[in-house]
Amino acid sequence: MIYPFSMGARVVYLDRPPTASVLMPTLAEVRPSVMLIVPLIIEKIYRHQILAKFTSSGFWRALYKIDFMRRYLHRVAGKKLMKVFGGRLRFLGIGGAKLDGGAEKFLLEARFPYAIGYGLTETAPLLAGAAPSQVRLGSTGPAAPGVELRLENVNPETRQGEIVAKTPSAMIGYYKNPDATKEVFTEDGWFRTGDLGEFSADGWLYIKGRLKNMIVGPSGENIYPEDIESVLNSHVCVADSVVTEHEGRLVALVHFNTDALEAKFDGWKEDFENWKENLKKEVVDYVNSKVNRFSRISEVVEEKQEFVKTPTQKIRRFLYTKRNPHQKHEMSKR
């Protein structure tokens, strides 16, 4: 708050969740030049508006598969999206969760002024980032000024390890919880982020996933469910997903996108049970054609209710990964 005010900026906060009905009129009124959002917002725009349009017919799908045509279509769509955001946007900062690869590729090819920031509440918060003119697909950028980053417990084969940080903005510790504080700091005082990552030769950070979410495959492979979920969520009929391990197999819990179902299947509500299994198989085949061998899913299980999420729109994974994926349950949103 203090910094933008000191620069003469006007700051606008939404007092309700940023649904399309809330966000669109606000953008038209405010016409922001700088905007900070969680990935879910831009992912929904990409899936429901951009991708849905370019996969709506055989003609569009054929064009979209051609590299130079896809880039051209993304550029045209990006100009329209800029108008939706008010036409004055210079910086769209995205953070709080991992951005879907398809959505980021669209932003990059559309030449949209976006950048991804990486940080935690405990580091107040920025650790790495880049300017919109410098972004690289899949990377959060180099360490921010005044921040040092390194990897701990690096796997010699993958070159990946836990990201640890040293910065003046890091917290001193958790309030009246010395045990938790001790766990998140190395012996030489660096903060353990709990995230797995790797660096390029010139120091750009690529985040692979949460250490606690990583699944160890049958032959010792490191499987990152977030990467599989990114592919799952790029399917036009998938709204959200969680990948979990069950009895040595990877199972995908999927909440389907009802708008996409309506567009793809006439009268889908009346005939859902008859074609649901075919759709599940379609999703399995779609994912397994795009991931490596040990990240292939064996099954899709429908999650009829929306996933329970945090205020920053992250799925509360622990509610789903610790139970039998076939278990019927009722969960209220929190």
PLM-predicted stretches and their roles:
Residues T167, G173, L196-R293:
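AMP-binding/adenylate-forming catalytic core of the ANL superfamily
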Residues G8, D195, R317:
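Active-site-proximal glycine-rich helix-loop-beta segment
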Residues M1-K79, R88:
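Conserved AMP-binding/adenylation subdomain of ANL enzymes
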Residues T158-R159, S200, Y206, I223, ...:
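Generic structural signal for well-ordered beta-strand positions
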Residues V11, M35, Y72-L205, L211-M214, ...:
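Conserved AMP-binding/adenylate-forming
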Residues D240-G248, E282-R334:
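Conserved C-terminal "lid"/linker of ANL adenylate-forming enzymes
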